[in-house]
Amino acid sequence: DEATLLNKFLLKYYEIMPTLITGWNIDFFDIPYLYNRICHVLGESQARTLSPIKDVIWLKHRNRYRISGVSCLDYMALYKNFTYNEESSYSLEAISQKELGKGKMKYEGTLDDLMKNDIQGYIDYNMNDVDLVYEIDQKMKLMDLARGICHKGHVPYEDFLFPTRYLDGAALTYMKRLGIVAPNKPRHDEIKHVDLLGAYVKAPNPGRYKWVYDLDLTSLYPSII
């Protein structure tokens, strides 16, 4: 039954105790589905053991769960962020066909039919999905790229999507060198709403300047061509 399945999954999870998880669209399917099913079947306290410090938080502003102590790098987000062509579809089938020349395992009927009538075929279908993501990363090395950038920028792996976080990393590193312990940044749900005026925009004076850089080349490029 489902409870037995989830308990066996958790035992294997504790045995591995991953510090980094990846998969295709895991932020919006696999992780929330798994967490919510464990909550429903085994209880929330058991679901929180996905985190080594038993802290799983719903990030409303990012519409995803954060498993404290476990970095979740959604490979679909990595692919979107580090490739330059706009794809008509970002499904695993479409991207694996493009990058590997092969796709998901074919089957007749629905996935529910496959599970009920051919459990080994159902397992093979899911294992094939895992293999596709692994082979895409073996080719493109986007996990290594994201980790390298985040190590350089002194930010958590999940923050590869947010260029301004590298300013936080630089500030924290500088303060550490000065022997200053920076306060923890408040969580989004701890920040009180305050109406603020818009930022000051200074009229640019054309010229050549030192010590100027822009973190966001995506928005910078159209303004300098």
Language model features: what each stretch is:
Residues 27, 76, 218:
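Anionic group-transfer/hydrolysis microenvironments
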Residues 112-225:
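Common nucleic-acid-contacting/processivity interface regions adjacent to the catalytic cores
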Residues 31, 40, 44-130:
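Active-site-proximal helix-loop-helix substrate-binding element of RNase H-like nuclease domains
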Residues 1-11:
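Mobile, glycine- and charge-enriched loop segments
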